[in-house]
Amino acid sequence: MIESQRHSYHLVDPSPWPISGSLGALATTVGGVMYMHSFQGGATLLSLGLIFLLYTMFVWWRDVLRESTLEGHHTKAVQLGPRYGSILFIVSEVMFLFAFFWASSHSSLAPTVEIGGIWPPKGIGVLDPWEIPLLNTPILPSSGAAVTWAHHAILAGKEKRAVYALVATVSLALVSTGFQGMEYYQAPSTISDSIYGSTFFLATGFHGFHVIIGTLFLIVCGIRQYLGLMTKKHHVGFEAAAWYWHFVDVVRLFPFVSIYWWGGI
């Protein structure tokens, strides 16, 4: 028998996923340190920790979707929590990328004597910003327009149109990731080539990692939309994915200007 409640908040049931996620994160961290320092068993512990962590993420999000879609626990008051959490998460990611861009700008504006006082350091090859980087830059903002199209389609109750828009968004995202892979393959330097290589691959790679995560997020939203699991009133997961994607596509402009173009002159 289901007991009635006089409030609009969801009192969650006891869950094993917080502790399992913590153990997975611990194993991943310790295994990563052991692997980097060539300790025996480091690679095994790292692999097991990652698998355990990914499994926990999957089943935890599965439970959240069940609570919202099948059990109807996500009232308007409950939906505010994921919205605020998504916004704060994006703000924290902005701080991450800001730190990497700051490191690149600091190193290029005041090059040390160890690299000859010039930027880029002598002997370090740089990518031509007017080739693949320029071609890749407008793709993500275009995908941002497509995800906005999907949002408007969901609000209008046009399910098929929303699916088409999400397919277009994911397709553009995959093209962008492919271009970045080509760019890395053709790069004349590596991450170990002085501070230039370190900051270049760290900043652009971290952004590329965000693109991959956002693509997976949108693929899940596309599948749920295709199955009819999102409505005009209940699509918080899609809103979080759209906000995250707009963050990703806008940020793309900063590495092009500050790292590819200005930092590579």
Curated annotation (Swiss-Prot):
One of its GO terms (molecular function) is cytochrome-c oxidase activity. It catalyses: 4 Fe(II)-[cytochrome c] + O2 + 8 H(+)(in) = 4 Fe(III)-[cytochrome c] + 2 H2O + 4 H(+)(out). Gene3D superfamilies: 1.10.287.70, Cytochrome c oxidase, subunit III, four-helix bundle. The chain crosses the membrane at residues 16-36, 41-61, 84-104, 162-182, 200-220, 245-265. It is an enzyme of class 7 (translocase). GO terms for biological process: mitochondrial electron transport, cytochrome c to oxygen. InterPro entries: Cyt_c/ubiquinol_Oxase_su3, Cyt_c_oxase_su3_dom, Cyt_c_oxidase-like_su3, Cyt_c_oxidase_su3-like_sf, Cyt_c_oxidase_su3_a-hlx. It is found in: Mitochondrion inner membrane. The keyword Membrane applies. The keyword Phosphoprotein does not apply. Its main location: mitochondrion. One of its GO terms (cellular component) is mitochondrial inner membrane. It is a multi-pass membrane protein. SUPFAM superfamilies: Cytochrome c oxidase subunit III-like. Its EC number is 7.1.1.9. Keywords: Membrane, Mitochondrion, Mitochondrion inner membrane, Translocase, Transmembrane, Transmembrane helix. Belongs to the cytochrome c oxidase subunit 3 family. Component of the cytochrome c oxidase (complex IV, CIV), a multisubunit enzyme composed of a catalytic core of 3 subunits and several supernumerary subunits. The complex exists as a monomer or a dimer and forms supercomplexes (SCs) in the inner mitochondrial membrane with ubiquinol-cytochrome c oxidoreductase (cytochrome b-c1 complex, complex III, CIII). PANTHER family: CYTOCHROME C OXIDASE SUBUNIT 3, CYTOCHROME C OXIDASE SUBUNIT III. Component of the cytochrome c oxidase, the last enzyme in the mitochondrial electron transport chain which drives oxidative phosphorylation. The respiratory chain contains 3 multisubunit complexes succinate dehydrogenase (complex II, CII), ubiquinol-cytochrome c oxidoreductase (cytochrome b-c1 complex, complex III, CIII) and cytochrome c oxidase (complex IV, CIV), that cooperate to transfer electrons derived from NADH and succinate to molecular oxygen, creating an electrochemical gradient over the inner membrane that drives transmembrane transport and the ATP synthase. This is Cytochrome c oxidase subunit 3.
